[in-house]
Structures are given as C-alpha cells and as structure tokens.
C-alpha cells in the first residue's frame, strides 16, 4: 500500500509539472536536489517556473502563501484535520484568486489541498527557497556574537567572509546575538563551522585543567 501511495504521489507531481507547460517538455533540474515529499513538489514547481521564466515571481508568491498560512484564522481552518477537504480546496481557490497568483502557484496550492498535503506547504516553500538561493549563487552565512557589532567591525567581517567565496557566489549574511556565548563569535559559512566564542574557550580551558589535576 505504501508503495502505491508513493507511486500515486509521484504521478500527481509529474502531472502538476506538465499541467502548465507544453507536453513532453524536458524536466529542468533544480541546482540542488532536495529529497522527501517537499522536494518532489518543489522540484516540479521549479521546473515549470523555470520554463516560463517566472522563478522570481513564484518565489515571491510562495512567500506570500507562507504569510497567509500563518494567519490564525486561515491556519485554524486549513490545517484542521476535521475540516472537509472540499472546503479547504474552495477556500484556497478563493484565496489564490483574490491574491491574483500565477497559475503555477495556484496549481501547486490546489494540488497540495486535494492531496491532503497542506501541512507540507511550509516545507515545500522552504525547499523552493533553498533552490532559489543556490540558483542565485548565494552562500548562507550565520555569525553569532554576544553583543551587536558596530558598522566598522561588520564591514570588516563581511570583507573577510567574502574572501572565502568563489567567483559568482554571493554572501547571504545573517547576524545573531546570543549573550550566552559570553564573547567572541561563532561563524557558520556554507559547510564550514568555526567556534571562536569565549564560552567554548573557557570550556576547553576547564577540561584541560581537569586533565592536569
């Protein structure tokens, strides 16, 4: 039964991918492969949107969908398992029409509703955003400090971080404040992770002292 369910989902996603583009068109592969249900839907959407040169438009529309689904009234209705699927489909159809979403985004939302996959919508949106980030050559970087950085220090930090990038890559920096690290900073850029926090240094010193004693 599980195999049949997966097969059925794959077929429905393929149908969605070709429903708004010419039949038998070659699938456009996204720049990064994401597995799972969200990956299947996001890949189909990326392929269809790429062929119509509407990747950026669909990305903006999906962000709007995410905002709408966070509204208490909408979330209570659409994510409630006791609300009939037909009611959810009608509600979403009205919403996409009101927002004037493209057929690409509207078809995706309707398909998720019809398949009872609305709870997967945030994950699908996240997967598509990841694909778009890689498409733009963005390299995610998170810097955590104990206190806010001044402009001069932040500018210097950006210069250093950009020196690690390859040609065509774009730094996507997020700065977080976490007083618990006590000082220094923690940097995560791409797959690299460097912990230069005072907290970690103190912990290492503490372990070293215990070994000596």
UniProtKB/Swiss-Prot annotation:
The lineage of its organism: Eukaryota, Metazoa, Chordata, Craniata, Vertebrata. The modification N6-succinyllysine is found at residues 90, 100, 158, 162, 199. It comes from the Eukaryota. Keywords: Acetylation, ATP synthesis, Hydrogen ion transport, Ion transport, Membrane, Mitochondrion, Mitochondrion inner membrane, Transit peptide, Transport, Ubl conjugation. It is found in: Mitochondrion; Mitochondrion inner membrane. Residues 1-23 form a transit peptide. Component of the ATP synthase complex composed at least of ATP5F1A/subunit alpha, ATP5F1B/subunit beta, ATP5MC1/subunit c (homooctomer), MT-ATP6/subunit a, MT-ATP8/subunit 8, ATP5ME/subunit e, ATP5MF/subunit f, ATP5MG/subunit g, ATP5MK/subunit k, ATP5MJ/subunit j, ATP5F1C/subunit gamma, ATP5F1D/subunit delta, ATP5F1E/subunit epsilon, ATP5PF/subunit F6, ATP5PB/subunit b, ATP5PD/subunit d, ATP5PO/subunit OSCP. This is ATP synthase peripheral stalk subunit OSCP, mitochondrial. Its main location: mitochondrion. The modification N6-acetyllysine is found at residues 54, 60, 70, 73, 100, 158, 162, 172, 176, 192. GO terms for biological process: proton motive force-driven mitochondrial ATP synthesis. Subunit OSCP, of the mitochondrial membrane ATP synthase complex (F(1)F(0) ATP synthase or Complex V) that produces ATP from ADP in the presence of a proton gradient across the membrane which is generated by electron transport complexes of the respiratory chain. ATP synthase complex consist of a soluble F(1) head domain - the catalytic core - and a membrane F(1) domain - the membrane proton channel. These two domains are linked by a central stalk rotating inside the F(1) region and a stationary peripheral stalk. The keyword Lipid metabolism does not apply. One of its GO terms (molecular function) is proton-transporting ATP synthase activity, rotational mechanism. NCBIfam families: ATP_synt_delta.
């Amino acid at each position: 039964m599980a195999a049949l369910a997966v097969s059925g989902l794959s077929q429905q996603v393929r149908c969605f991918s070709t429903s708004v583009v010419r039949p038998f068109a070659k699938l456009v592969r996204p720049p990064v492969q994401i597995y799972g249900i969200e990956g299947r839907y996001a890949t189909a959407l990326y392929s269809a949107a790429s062929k119509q040169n509407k990747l950026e438009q669909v990305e903006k529309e999906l962000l709007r969908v995410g905002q709408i689904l966070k509204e208490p009234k909408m979330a209570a209705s659409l994510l409630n398992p006791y609300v009939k699927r037909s009611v959810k489909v009608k509600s979403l159809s009205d919403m996409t029409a009101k927002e004037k979403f493209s057929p690409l985004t509207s078809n995706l939302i309707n398909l998720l509703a019809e398949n009872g996959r609305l709870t997967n919508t945030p994950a699908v949106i996240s997967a598509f955003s990841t694909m778009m980030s890689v498409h733009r050559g963005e390299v995610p970087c998170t810097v955590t400090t104990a206190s806010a950085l001044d402009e001069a220090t932040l500018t210097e930090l950006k210069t250093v971080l950009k020196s690690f990038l390859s040609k065509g890559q774009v730094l996507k920096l997020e700065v977080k404040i976490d007083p618990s690290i006590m000082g220094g900073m923690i940097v995560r850029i791409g797959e690299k992770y460097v912990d230069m926090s005072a907290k970690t240094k103190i912990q290492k010193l503490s372990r070293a002292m215990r070994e000596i004693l």
